[in-house]
Amino acid sequence: MKKINLAVVGATGMVGRTFLKVLEERQLPIENFYVMASSRSAGSKLTFNGKEYTVEELTEHSFDKPIDIALFSAGGGTSEKFAPIAAAHGCIVIDNSSQWRMDPEVPLVVPEVNPEDIAWHKNIIANPNCSTIQAIVALKPLDDKYKIKRVVYSTYQAVSGAGVAGWKDLENGLKGEAPKKFPHPIANNCLPHIDSFLDNGYTKEEMKMVNETRKILHNDNMRVTATTVRVPVFDCHSESINIEFEKPFEMDELLETLKNAPGVVLQNNSEANEYPLAVDAAGHDEVFIGRVRRDESVESGVNIWVVADNIRKGAATNAVQIAEEIVKNMQ
C-alpha cells in the first residue's frame, strides 16, 4: 500500500484517541501524521506509534499542507465548517458526525456492506451512526439472501455513546451524584431518550437509524422503525432486531449465512448460555450476533440480538476500514 499523509481531527476526544489506537493496530501505511483539535486542546501531547505528537489547533489553514486523508470526529459544527475546506484542498474526509450522512452527494459507508459506494465520493465520506453500523453488518447478508421487507430496532445503548460526559454521569451516578449530561439519572435506570425529540415523537437517534438503514442498503421503501434507549452500561451497544423477509427461509441456512458474513461472530448456543454480551464485545471490532429465532407471529421473520463495541466498530474502526479501502485503490 502507498504511504499516506493522514490527519486526525478531534484527536483528544474519546473517538479521536481510539482512532490512534486502531490505526496503530491495523498498521495503515502513514508517511506524515497530524493530530488536530480545538484551541482548548491545542498544545497537548499524544503518542502514536511510539512517537509524541503535539496537537495542532484546527484552523482554515490546517489543510494548506498536503494531507491525503483526514479522520474527523469533532462534532457536526466542526465538520460543517472544516470538511469542505479540507475537501477543497484535495484531502479525503471521513467524517464521524451526522453532518453529511444524508447528503445525497456523500457516500454513507460500512466497508463490509457497501464498499463500492466509496468510489463516487467527492472528497467527503460519512461514517454512519454507531447503532446503525452494527445493525447493518447483521442485516446486509440477510437482505441479500431473503430480501428484507421490514425492520424493528430496539436498542440498549452504552453511555460512552454520549462521550466522556455520558461516561461520567454513570460513574458519578453510581456514587449518588446528580446527572450533568443526561436529563435523568442513568445509574440503575434506562432512558428512552437519545438525542432530541422530533415533531413525529421519535428522537433524532431513532430517525438516524431509520434513514441510514435505507440509504446504506439502497432501499428507500424499506419499512424501518426504531426505539433507542440509553442503558447503564459503560461500553458496547446491544440491539434487539426483528426482521421480516419477502422470501421464506430455513433456519439452518440463515444461521450459516450469518456465520459466513464478513465482520460477524455468531454466538448462538442457548443450551450453553452462549449469546453476545457487552462485556465480551468490548475492545473487539467484530459484530456479535446471537439469540437467533424465528418470529412465529409473521410468515417469514426472525429475531436477532446484536452487540458491538460502539467506539471501535461503531466509530473509529469503521472509519479506519474506509481509509484502508481508499488506500488500496490509490495509485
What are these regions (language model features)?
Residues M1-I186, M222-R223, V287-F288, V292-V298, ...:
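N-terminal Rossmann-like NAD(P) cofactor-binding subdomain of oxidoreductases
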Residues A70, V159-Q331:
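Charged docking surfaces used in two-component/phosphorelay signaling
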